[in-house]
Every structure is written in C-alpha cells, then in structure tokens.
Swiss-Prot record:
The chain crosses the membrane at residues 9-29, 62-82, 87-107. The keyword Translocase applies. The gene is ND3. Core subunit of the mitochondrial membrane respiratory chain NADH dehydrogenase (Complex I) that is believed to belong to the minimal assembly required for catalysis. Complex I functions in the transfer of electrons from NADH to the respiratory chain. The immediate electron acceptor for the enzyme is believed to be ubiquinone. This is NADH-ubiquinone oxidoreductase chain 3.
Length: 118
C-alpha cells in the first residue's frame, strides 16, 4: 500500500489546488455591476448585432464529432508508420484491419447521410 502513497499525495494536492482555484474568484469578485453595457457581449468595438448565446444547428456538432473521431485515428497511424520496418506481419495486418474498420465506419456515415449538408 505504501507504493501508492505518491499517487495519493498527487491526487490530494491536485484536488486542493483545483478547489482553491475555483474558490478564489468567489472571494474577490464583486456583484456590483449595475451597468448593462458590462453584461452585454463584446463584438470588436461594434454594437452587438444579436444575442451572443444563439443556438447552433445540430449538423455542426455532428460534423465536429465526426472530425474528432476520424482525426483521432491519425494518432495511431504515425507510430505505426514510424515502426513499420520493425513490426512483423502481425502488426501490418492488424493495422490493415484497423484501416478496414475505419473505412467501413466512414462508408456507414456517408450512407447514413451524416456527411451531406442539406
């Protein structure tokens, strides 16, 4: 149990630092803002054109999630490409299986219409 002491100390210290950083603004902040200009959104010196908290279309979220998912796989390609001359046939075919799963996933998204912007 003693070998986990540094991890526990690290977790306690990080929790304390997080709580302190969350609590300090409440101690020093004031709610005496009676000016409505201070509560409005700032748009590069111009008067705001509309509400700053407007809703986004769900397609933006879908495209961003798809981008994150398929962009994350690029992080697997780089170590594989760097160590391609050192891995054996199993490493090569496992990456080919991974690429096949990615290809099937992108075909599925394409057929479902997630990539079409209507």
């Amino acid at each position: 149990m003693l070998e986990f002491a540094p991890i526990c100390i690290y977790l306690v210290i990080s929790l304390l630092v997080s709580l302190i950083l969350l609590g300090v603004p409440f101690l020093f902040a004031s709610n005496s803002s009676t000016y409505p200009e201070k509560l409005s959104a700032y748009e590069c010196g111009f008067d705001p054109f509309g509400d700053a908290r407007s809703r986004f279309d769900i397609r933006f979220y879908l495209v961003s999630i798809l981008f994150i998912i398929f962009d994350l796989e690029v992080t697997f390609f780089f170590p594989w490409a760097v160590s391609l001359n050192k891995i054996d046939l199993f490493g090569f075919w496992s990456m080919m299986a991974f690429l096949l799963i990615l290809f099937i996933g992108s075909l599925y998204e394409w057929k479902r219409g997630a990539l079409d912007w209507e």
